[in-house]
Amino acid sequence: MAATEAAAADSAGPAPGVPATPASTRGAAAASSPWRPPESRLQGSRPRPARARAAAPVPPARELIQPTVSELSRAVRTNILCTVRGCGKILPNSPALNMHLVKSHRLQDGIVNPTIRKDLTTAPKFYCCPIKGCPRGPDRPFSQFSLVKQHFMKMHAEKKHKCSKCSNSYGTEWDLKRHEEDCGKTFQCTCGCPYASRTALQSHIYRTGHEIPAEHRDPPSKKRKMESYLQNQKLSSKTTEPLSDQAAPRQDAAEPDAPEVKPAASLEDSCSAHTKKQSVATPPRCPQKLLLPKPKVALVKLPVMQFSPVPVFVPTAESSAQPVVLGVDHSSAAGTVHLVPLSVGALILSLDSEACSLKESLPLSKIISPVVEPMNTGVQVNLGKSLCSPLQEVGSVCQRTSISSSNVQTDLTYASANLIPSAQWLGPDSSVSSCSQTDLSFDSQVSLPVSVHTQTLVPSSKVTSSIAAQTDAFIDACFQPGGVSRETQTSRMQNRTNDSVPVGHTGLCGDIFESVHASYSVPTDTIMSSSLVAETGTHGLPPQSDPKILGQVMEKSAPVLNFSTQNGLLPAHTMTDNQTQTIDLLSDLENILSSNLPGQTLDNRSLLSDTNPGPDAQLPAGSAQNSGIDFDIEEFLSASNIQTQTEESELSSMSTEPVLESLDIETQTDVLLSDPSTQPYGFRAGSGFLGLEMFDTQTQTDLNFFLDSSPHLPLGSILKHSSFSMSTDSSDTETQTEGACPARHLPALESKVQLSSTETQTMSSGFEPLGNLFLTSNETQTAMDDFLLADLAWNTMESQFSSVETQTCAELHAVSSF
């Protein structure tokens, strides 16, 4: 430090005993400096030897500027408006204004478009103090104007700012503030020697080599930054700390200022202590919340729709709630939540639900949703009130057939009136099955592009209703022509429970939320193109040993099973030839099947291949598209349902391709419970409201399978190629089929006059001999010419198929003797 002060004294003035250097000589030396004048060197630096200066190249002459006192004493300009017309930007000070002019407007010293980089050929500018006798005169100028101004304000300007503790005065407010930080303090060395300033203490330490105290190690600027940082931290922590922590007084405020020598604590120690205190006292700002609670009971104001992997809660058009997709994995842990746009949710029916709750007794592991299993949800929706919204087009409900949903299981006590404006739904005690629509075939082994899985949870104490429609083409505006759509409604009453055998599929009704294996899938397929091949799968019915029974003691009435086409939704396609076959399971049915099917092995999940011997070998080439039919003899014998096999003919004049290659497009109805007080369904002519409808196995059978070279058509030939589901009900069943078609959609052909209505009534008794299996009376017999209109070569099967279709015999042997 002494050497530095001596060097500063040498540079300020000639030391005693050293010859003074004339100003001209110093100016010449400055001019001969290779980089910059010696006056601009750092304080205490040694001058370069004369030999080095002489050998270096001569730089360009410097430009010395001596500002006036008025310029130096002028106050610093703030909030300066840009001088360029139209700019309007306000700069905080003059240097910022100059930088703005150069960077934004390319203006510098009145020159348009100057280069940003300084020209190295220009002479450097230096600024000297204008006060005579000042050591920072022309011999020791400053390299910047701000430096000479700072020097002038500190050394020569009027000292207007006085300290309140002492008599010192300062020319600038900043100097006074810096002085007040150390005014009255004593800086003591570790040896005990006190000093009035930190600078004097540092000089002492440099001379003696003593250890600097910890409180004086950091410079004042760093201390100020640390103190401001700590102050900001305290202000932010006060917002989160409890009131008890805020009441604690600060340690530095409690300390008295009386002693002249103030021992300061270590800055690092104080920082660490404050950090520790903050970490302990400050609670987390945002406590962690679980993404989804454990779904024991959920109240949802949204209708329910399910895609293949996860269930979807879709809002209505008027609802402002966000749709939520809830996924549940196998380990009973809630998965992720996805947001679904409302355009996707427009596929579901518009339902206004009161509450959606999961059963508390249902384990969460039973709500898993595998793609290959038919049952994958346990969502139960209770709908309270009906909607009075006007009837909308079905096309607005279903945007595209590519948006698919499958494997839906619901227990709906009410539904929207969008689909049935002409009749109100039942009371809150009724149950409604939801609709499903998909473009993927999961459980069919024929060339069908569409498969629907619909399962209905039906309490035994409720009369249930079902909307079970597979839709490929609602209207021409929404779908491509050529699709076939059919909606059926069914009602049937089970009047006795004393003699009834436990119904196999009732396990779905009682234990749908308790056992995954007690359910079965229900595919319903509609053929659109013979080139589309869908995936196949096998599904069976639940075992017969399920102890729960659907039947209840109800007064015996004539139940009606109604099938009718929905002509209002399909103006371009007419559905005809509705055939109903009802088979009740008897104890010796297995023997009959075994005798009629000697060449067919009936195992669990067995499939009938295309290469079966017998009538299949003589099929024409046009019927080769038929694949195997899923047939399970054990589930076939243990099932309890009424299976409806429907052949439908597309009589549209626009369709010229033989679409009647494959028949038995739809398989409808399981066990039906009806109520005499049910109101008719809005879209069906002369049909009762749906009771309980459980879709069963899908079958699609080529009519050529009914052909045989032998003059006789055995019952096994029918059952082998059709997936019949047997019924063991003790109640009498009456089946009525109505297929009314508007005359405007039918071509003016004689052979199609009789196609306008086909009505078949079938009476069957569960525990009577097998001879009464087909007791059928036909009120209207469909002519065989309607099958010839589809360009199918069925000339050899007219008599055989008409016999199968009408079934006018009173005994079973009459069917097999054709």
UniProtKB/Swiss-Prot annotation:
PROSITE patterns: ZINC_FINGER_C2H2_1
BP GO terms, sorted: DNA damage response; motile cilium assembly; positive regulation of DNA-templated transcription; positive regulation of gene expression; positive regulation of non-motile cilium assembly; positive regulation of transcription by RNA polymerase II
Superkingdom of origin: Eukaryota
Database matches in Pfam families: C2H2_ASCIZ, C2H2_ASCIZ_4th, C2HC_ASCIZ
C2H2-type Zn finger ranges: 80-105, 161-181
GO MF annotation terms: DNA-binding transcription activator activity, RNA polymerase II-specific; dynein complex binding; transcription cis-regulatory region binding; zinc ion binding
InterPro entries from the UniProt entry: ATMIN, C2H2_ASCIZ_1st_2nd, Znf_C2H2_ASCIZ_4th, Znf_C2H2_type, Znf_C2HC_ASCIZ_3rd
Record protein name field: ATM interactor
